[in-house]
């Protein structure tokens, strides 16, 4: 079945947060495995009273709070073995090849694939939708983006395109060798992209799109998003982040060492399942793709600096950037456009270097919260060869956070 739809410091009084967490209704310990889960009612971080950093989120607390940014997702969940999908991010709704955006890529640990990244960093431009999927589908996705790009009105004579495609390996839950992501899945995700600024649905999180088959810290991972809006005195800009989480480490939420008390293997034993056959349960390996959007007027050099800060959000949740972890951050500005028809020069706005620090902080905080959201919203998934990844249990997590933040 294909389902398509289309985020550290803890603030506030600790005592208030502890009381708030304890008064929320408890939910089931784990979500039953499902190939097509119903509407996701699992909480986001702020539903648990958690906040991250100084700045407030935008209205949707999503990457689509950055004006013009679009997100589309296609989830592939078919039979017992297919658990994968596509997530597409569009910097704007126009012709991206003819009206490119300033962009950059920061590579923290390059054990992975990010097709198109070398040209992005060479030219400082992004000219296609950004697509996330699974490891073996990046090549088919890149081909689909190229075909989609040259087919757009106004691109009839375009002889090239630079698809930007990232991945994580979902082969534990998904029959990755089956190459189930097809060209029409990619174009469907792009075409069905919706933005909160256009009145569309919020970005769906958890076990959806490119996060359908991913695992993080031994729990079910997925897609997460968050945003920050700077006050007018600091520019009034918005920073939005979207993540695809499939990595490990020692899970830490809002500074609380969750990994010490709440572990996937222990939860599996409560079901009579040893959990020992899950290599992700105690592994720091895996990958994380981070996409950072902003309406601040930044050039490619500044955007690479912004992307680098997003990696610090991974560190806050306990990532150690292990040998086998492919950790990439893509950043773009919706303000600085580069016209394909430009001749010798074109003017751009550029933010002063001293004004970057609030944006850096916003990117770190939004990345941290997006990762936490990806875990909280993820539902339990059973897939390839009956492998199973449990959603992190909300009642136990709530009690742990409450006791630690009291």
Q: Where are the language model's segments positioned?
A:
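N-terminal secretory signal peptides that target proteins for export/translocation
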Residues: 1-11
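Bacterial N-terminal signal peptides
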Residues: 12-25
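Short linear sequence motifs
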Residues: 9, 13, 45-48
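Alpha/propeptide regions of enzymes that mature by internal proteolysis
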Residues: 29-406
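Sequence-pattern detector for short linear motifs
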Residues: 6-8, 17, 274
């Amino acid at each position: 079945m294909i389902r398509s739809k289309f985020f550290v410091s803890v603030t506030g009084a600790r005592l208030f947060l502890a009381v708030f967490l304890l008064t929320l209704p408890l939910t089931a310990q784990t979500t039953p495995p499902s190939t097509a889960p119903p509407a996701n009612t699992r909480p986001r971080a702020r539903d648990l009273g958690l906040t991250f950093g100084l700045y407030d989120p935008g209205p949707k607390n999503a990457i689509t709070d950055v004006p013009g940014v679009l997100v589309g997702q296609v989830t592939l969940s078919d039979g017992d073995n297919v658990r994968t999908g596509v997530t597409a991010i569009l910097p704007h709704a126009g012709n991206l090849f003819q009206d490119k955006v300033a962009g950059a890529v920061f590579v923290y640990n390059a054990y992975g694939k990010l097709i198109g990244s070398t040209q992005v960093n060479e030219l400082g431009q992004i000219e296609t939708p950004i697509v996330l999927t699974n490891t073996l589908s990046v090549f088919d996705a890149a081909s689909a983006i190229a075909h989609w790009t040259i087919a757009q009105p106004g691109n009839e004579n375009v002889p090239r395109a630079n698809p930007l495609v990232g991945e994580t390996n979902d082969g534990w839950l998904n029959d990755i060798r089956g190459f189930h992501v097809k060209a029409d899945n990619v174009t469907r995700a792009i075409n069905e992209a919706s933005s909160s600024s256009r009145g569309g649905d919020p970005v769906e999180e958890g076990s959806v799109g490119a996060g359908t088959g991913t695992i993080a810290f031994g729990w079910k991972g997925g897609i997460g998003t968050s945003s920050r809006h700077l006050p007018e005195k600091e520019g009034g800009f918005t920073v939005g982040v979207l993540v695809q989480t499939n990595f490990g480490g020692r899970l830490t939420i809002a500074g609380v060492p969750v990994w010490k008390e709440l572990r996937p293997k222990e939860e599996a034993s409560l079901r009579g399942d040893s959990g020992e056959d899950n290599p992700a349960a105690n592994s720091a390996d895996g990958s994380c793709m981070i996409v950072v959007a902003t309406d601040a007027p930044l050039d490619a050099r500044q955007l690479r600096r912004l992307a680098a800060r997003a990696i610090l959000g991974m560190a806050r949740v306990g990532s150690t950037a292990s040998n086998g972890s492919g950790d990439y951050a893509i950043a773009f500005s919706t303000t600085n456009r580069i016209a394909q028809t430009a001749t010798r020069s074109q003017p751009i706005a550029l933010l002063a270097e001293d004004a970057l620090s609030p944006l850096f902080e916003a990117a770190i905080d939004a990345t941290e919260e997006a990762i936490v959201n990806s875990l909280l919203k993820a539902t339990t998934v059973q897939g390839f060869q009956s492998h199973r990844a449990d959603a992190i249990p909300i009642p136990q997590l709530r009690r742990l956070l409450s006791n630690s933040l009291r």
